[in-house]
Amino acid sequence: MTATSLWELAERARKRLSEIAKGNRDRALLAMADLLEARWEEVLRANREDLEEAERTGLPKAKLDRLALKEKDLKTLTEGLRQIARLPDPLGRIEGLAKRPNGLRVGRMRVPLGLIGFIYEARPGATVEAVSVALKAGNAMLLRGGKEAFRSNRALVALWHEALGEAGLPEEAVTLVPTTDREAVLEMCRLELLDLLIPRGGEELIRLVQREARVPVLAHAKGVNHLYVDKKADLSMALRLALNGKTQRPAVCNALETVLVHEKVAEAFLPRLEKAMREKGVELRACPRALPLLKEAVPAREDEWDREYLDLVLRVKVVSGLEEALAHIARYGSRHTEAICTEDPKAAWRFLEEVDASLVLWNASTRFNDGFELGLGAEIGISTSKLHAYGPMGPMELTTLKWVALGEGQERT
């Protein structure tokens, strides 16, 4: 598609922004949940066509996993929609209202960001989750999904249009770029009508958007996530957290990629970890200190400690203590999700305070870095940059604040 036609799509969406913010957005979310339940087979049929083509073209297993919609996804998506609908409206509230000496009352009002461009790879569930979050906050969305999920996305956007119609909202609130041409990504990056761009996908996509964008970018970058097993850890708990983080769904950004083990518990813990991971088909790649304690692990290369596998591969490193664990995470982590397993509150609180990540956990799985699990209903992504949001981005993170002043005829002297 041409840059001109993309501009026209965006311009039509912008013109309806005020209608979206003032309209019955919760009704649209509830209508979408009902439509998904009634028409899920249509969506699955489109998804199967995408999967068949992706398999023919040799799409990697990790991407096939993200592309596939399953029966259980229906419950997750509909629960997320209904949970977001129940959340308080983030718009219109005035925060910090204070009276000045001259009687003028000033505060800051929550308003939508505006028109959001969302560029994402083969993950059709995001077409529901991301739109629901943006819509709750009164924003319009211009979507450019991965070519592998084009049929799935088209089917889901068609349902969104029906839901918007039932709620009396304009279809332009959700617009799918009608092409799989990669040039459309570059055109969106140059589209100055957008208020924000959110890329969600691999490193290559994120870097491309950050490099080419002419508007602000909120990046959902890779998840090089660690679990530190402290010397005072409950080792049975640590084993459960490692298994859940790595094997429940290895191809997602909050999956576990590295286990750091205190040297005082390494001999007791690592053989148990290897046995459990081997039963799940996980390959271990270990540091020189860990290798003698493991039967089938292979040496970890120095250049892979900052790699996101999104697969059944797990790195293991023995560390001298909390200090070395913190240094390793600071060097190789991606500011996504980090966890500590310990019964020592002092060590835990130091970890929580010093680790720089969008979610830091104590005695819990990295898999909890998710909008639904954290009570946001859903998320548009997990921001690993600190401006303008950090961590899972729910409706509140897709608003901004404008100053308002309530007067009684005051003039400046």
UniProtKB/Swiss-Prot annotation:
Signal peptide: none annotated. PROSITE patterns: PROA (PS01223). GO terms for molecular function: glutamate-5-semialdehyde dehydrogenase activity; NADP binding. One of its GO terms (biological process) is L-proline biosynthetic process. Keywords: Amino-acid biosynthesis, Cytoplasm, NADP, Oxidoreductase, Proline biosynthesis. Pathway: Amino-acid biosynthesis; L-proline biosynthesis; L-glutamate 5-semialdehyde from L-glutamate: step 2/2. Catalyzes the NADPH-dependent reduction of L-glutamate 5-phosphate into L-glutamate 5-semialdehyde and phosphate. The product spontaneously undergoes cyclization to form 1-pyrroline-5-carboxylate. This is Gamma-glutamyl phosphate reductase. It comes from Thermus thermophilus (strain ATCC 27634 / DSM 579 / HB8).
